[in-house]
């Protein structure tokens, strides 16, 4: 099987420096050792990009979307991006599908509606071994990938805003025609 392209892992965090932008990391440390690795990767990527960040914890992955909604409602201008971190390991019941699908659906809906740069670092795996491999900063670094995704979207929003401003300025300039009568 071919190795997936690791575009996010290969990004130079310093190249996507975001100055004083502030990001919110919301973690669900249900599996503490996995959460610690995810958080370490996310914090390292944000630090290299010179971003400021806060970390809050909630009991589980289903609580991450409501925590993000509360944070955005209570402090709408405080955060320029967010990162969700957690781990859902398949068990013997349908609970895995509910938690995985509903947390992803709610987060996607929220960040699209709010147009918030976001990185989803909630692992959905079959085993704890898979989770540890993906979370480890040395191997999978999915926490770092989630932070880099949020950083890249933040940069995109800033750069696209500049493109739009330039286009609007160009559109307002009078058109000079030659040969006027």
Swiss-Prot record:
Gene3D superfamilies: Lumazine/riboflavin synthase. Keywords: Riboflavin biosynthesis, Transferase. 5-amino-6-(D-ribitylamino)uracil binds at residues 30, 61-63, 87-89, 120. The active site is at 95 (proton donor). CDD domains: Lumazine_synthase-I (cd09209). Belongs to the DMRL synthase family. This is 6,7-dimethyl-8-ribityllumazine synthase. It comes from Beijerinckia indica subsp. indica (strain ATCC 9039 / DSM 1715 / NCIMB 8712). (2S)-2-hydroxy-3-oxobutyl phosphate binds at residues 92-93, 134. InterPro entries: LS, LS/RS, LS/RS_sf. GO terms for cellular component: cytosol; riboflavin synthase complex. GO terms for molecular function: 6,7-dimethyl-8-ribityllumazine synthase activity. Catalyzes the formation of 6,7-dimethyl-8-ribityllumazine by condensation of 5-amino-6-(D-ribitylamino)uracil with 3,4-dihydroxy-2-butanone 4-phosphate. This is the penultimate step in the biosynthesis of riboflavin. SUPFAM superfamilies: Lumazine synthase (SSF52121). It catalyses: (2S)-2-hydroxy-3-oxobutyl phosphate + 5-amino-6-(D-ribitylamino)uracil = 6,7-dimethyl-8-(1-D-ribityl)lumazine + phosphate + 2 H2O + H(+). Its EC number is 2.5.1.78. One of its GO terms (biological process) is riboflavin biosynthetic process.
